[in-house]
UniProtKB/Swiss-Prot annotation:
UniProt binding sites for Zn(2+) 1: H59, H61, D151, D304
NCBIfam families for the chain: PRK09357.1-2, pyrC_multi
Family the entry assigns: Belongs to the metallo-dependent hydrolases superfamily. DHOase family. Class I DHOase subfamily.
Pathway given in the UniProt record: Pyrimidine metabolism; UMP biosynthesis via de novo pathway; (S)-dihydroorotate from bicarbonate: step 3/3
GO molecular function terms listed in the Swiss-Prot or TrEMBL record: allantoinase activity; dihydroorotase activity; zinc ion binding
EC primary class: hydrolase
The entry's keywords: Hydrolase, Metal-binding, Pyrimidine biosynthesis, Zinc
Positions annotated as active site in the UniProt record: D304
Organism: Bacillus subtilis (strain 168)
One Pfam family it belongs to: Amidohydro_1
Enzyme Commission no: 3.5.2.3
Binding positions (substrate): H61, F62, R63, N93, N277, H308, F322, G323
Protein name according to UniProt: Dihydroorotase
GO cellular component: cytoplasm
Amino acid sequence: MSYLIKNGWILNENGEKTQADIRVTGETITAIGKLDATDNETVIDAKGLLVSPGFVDLHVHFREPGGEKKETIETGAKAAARGGYTTVAAMPNTRPVPDTKEQMEWVQNRIKETSCVRVLPYASITIRQIGDEMTNFEALKEAGAFAFTDDGVGIQTAGMMYEAMKRAAAIDKAIVAHCEDNSLIYGGSVHEGTFSKANGLNGIPSVCESVHIARDVLLAEAANCHYHVCHISTKESVRVVRDAKKAGIRVTAEVSPHHLLLCDEDIPGLDTNYKMNPPLRSPEDRAALIEGLLDGTIDFIATDHAPHTEEEKNTEMKLAPFGIVGLETAFPLLYTHFVKNGSWSLKQLIDYMTIKPCEAFGLPYGTLQTGQAADITLIDLEKEAVIDKETFLSKGKNTPFNGISCTGWPVATIAAGKLAYEEGRLVK
């Protein structure tokens, strides 16, 4: 299939708007400039639209196998495409866990059969993600593992993490860490702070996260391993990562949209759609995350898309599962709250969602260039709409942003040269 995207505008390296047409042939961008349509290609009229590299999210939970009531690879991929994402990386906290070559091959086949976007599967660090026995990294890499993580739980012993880092470094793969010391959770369901004290809830202290990061950056230095911090959430964690980068340690970090947008003081009542892990932290933590993203301490934005059923979330705060969905709302929320008000440039936001995650992990995506993968998102920066969870393509409706009005919405997504999502008014 061939497409010609006409009349749109792109951002150049300086963040300036430039009008350009883009030709897609097969899975590849084959021309950029002022182009005329040929008889054998489909024209997409992008007049008034930003033509962006497809978004990249290196932290999603698609729940399959074992959690299909919450999400599947197919429904998660559709949600990603609607949100403008063309590449996502799926976490391994499924049942069963992708901890063997055979299970990883099953996941890869399922992706090929059902996904409309590129899905990169993580493999687990430990068997069944219970932290006491290492998986076969070499076999899992051969089966297509993107990187290694036990996301959902932290690796509790330094010895296990150090061994994992040495094995990962030997095969040029990253260790991706959910940073949480179980001895410091204290049965908490929210941040230890204003909200927990006001509502009589056990709180999770900031040091629960930062102490693991402090341990792990030293282990990563010793192992010469690429160490990536998931969903960083505290000012202390930002400080540790900043210092580690200054020391030349191979550490990268991501931050979620919800930690950039909300803090614990924003939680209304006991709404479990505001319960995620790590929890919403203090206003000071939120400010440190924004500063860390802007100064390069934090490398990119990832949603930590974590769908649950409404039945699971419809309970008291201490019993509800952690997690919210984010793929279909990330760009409009961030554009509205940071770009529209002048805090960030449009190019900064686009980079945090495209080239930056690719640079962090050496992926050949995230740009609009001739010869590169045809991963393209068309965005209507003038479109205003209210977030409505009932329109989500994800099975998960667990969002704290339902009813929020946002400007700037993806309206079409091309993933590897195939039209993965469109609103129905663009193709001629």
